[in-house]
Amino acid sequence: MLRIYAPASSANISVGFDTLGAAISPIDGSLLGDVVQIESISTGFELESAGYFVRKLPKEPQKNIVYQAYVLFSEQLKLRGANVKPLRLTLEKNMPIGSGLGSSACSIVAALVALNQFHNEPFSKMELLEMMGELEGRISGSIHYDNVAPCYLGGVQFMVQSLGNICQKLPFFDNWYWVLAYPGIEVSTAEARAILPKSYTRQNVIAHGRHLGGFVHACHTHQENLAAIMMKDVIAEPYRESLLPNFAEVKQATRDLGALATGISGSGPTIFSIAPDLQTAIKLSSYLESHYLQNNEGFVHVCKVDNEGTREIK
């Protein structure tokens, strides 16, 4: 038996729409992500689901993304002249769906890594990553790697999709705390993408290029203040903030409390606030619990970047 944990991820990081993503884990050691367990059975294939958010999964097994991961993996394995072993997959769904924390990516990545390890790793990391992107595209409507790449590989990943590389790891600030607040409501990735305009003004394109270039430069030259200032979103946030509760007011309040930057995690409704120290992170956590959560499903976690990514757990 094998148990694989895939951590939550925060895509875009405000400044890098569809090009940046960070793997995130709570500092208290709790698992904010999905677990897939794989074990041998005598014949065939079985899929089971468990976990707090299991009730949010599709009722038909064929619509479960873990089932689709199994089908894609077996198809690719057949192209190599091999067949999948008889096995049972159990998805522990710990991540809320439509949260902006890479929920589907967690399930996809954990499932494919488990299947690959179970079959003695027939596929390379890049080959697995391509499969992950394809499955993610089936859910959101377009292939993108800004959740699956950091979830799988850890750290902050920059999508280059050139010279045989899908992504490259970006140096980052290990002293920063990420305060993640999920309000308990759902925003579908497809809906959040549909709300975006078909074209942008030249002014916005130039601003986006300046901010992203400045942010990447600041990460490589260890300039925290510049990196934080560059974390501006002219591509998605102005259009998506209407999907989030009191976003403008909450964003300003977090800045007043000392946040270096606040933005939408992925397509929302989770938001992130970057804190320079633990004391500020605790203040932000307390404020967001009181002012951003909408129901008992919501939560706030003080996190750091997870540099390990997807891994085997006991």
Swiss-Prot record:
Highest taxon above the source species: Bacteria
Alphabetical keyword list: Amino-acid biosynthesis, ATP-binding, Cytoplasm, Kinase, Nucleotide-binding, Threonine biosynthesis, Transferase
Its EC number(s): 2.7.1.39
Coiled-coil ranges per UniProt: none
Pathway named in the protein's UniProt entry: Amino-acid biosynthesis; L-threonine biosynthesis; L-threonine from L-aspartate: step 4/5
Catalyzed chemical reaction(s): L-homoserine + ATP = O-phospho-L-homoserine + ADP + H(+)
Matches recorded under Pfam families: GHMP_kinases_C, GHMP_kinases_N
GO BP annotations listed: threonine biosynthetic process
Molecular-function annotations in GO: ATP binding; homoserine kinase activity
Location(s), subcellular: Cytoplasm
GO cellular component terms given for this protein: cytoplasm
NCBIfam families assigned: PRK01212.1-4 (NF002288), thrB (TIGR00191)
UniProt name for this protein: Homoserine kinase
Species of origin: Haemophilus influenzae (strain ATCC 51907 / DSM 11121 / KW20 / Rd)
Origin organism lineage: Bacteria, Pseudomonadati, Pseudomonadota, Gammaproteobacteria, Pasteurellales
